[in-house]
Regions:
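Cytosolic nucleotide-binding catalytic cores of signal-transduction proteins
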Residues: 2-90
């Protein structure tokens, strides 16, 4: 469940979920879920499975949309990974 994942991320990843929500409050629940699962180190295929059995291509599209939404200077899978790593380090 989302609250359990948020709690675990805050404990194990230096407050990741709280930092993400505070810094980017415009992200909707689907975008947050994708970010949370990526921060746990899941692959695109695993994210697709845990996000409700969506298609791999949908996850890749969400990653690009998240980068656009937060106005991250990079996009696509590499940009999204960079964005997640940035949040993990702040």
């Amino acid at each position: 469940d989302r609250e359990d994942i948020k709690h675990w991320l805050n404990l194990s990843r230096n407050g990741f979920a709280d930092k993400l929500h505070k810094t980017y409050p415009m992200l909707d629940k689907t975008f947050l879920d994708i970010c949370y699962l990526a921060a746990l180190g899941l692959s695109i295929d695993e994210i697709a499975q845990y996000a409700g059995n969506i298609k791999r291509r949908s996850v890749e599209r969400y990653m690009s949309l998240i980068c656009q939404e937060v106005q991250y200077p990079m996009s696509g899978k590499k940009g999204f990974e960079s964005f997640i790593n940035h949040i993990l380090t702040i």
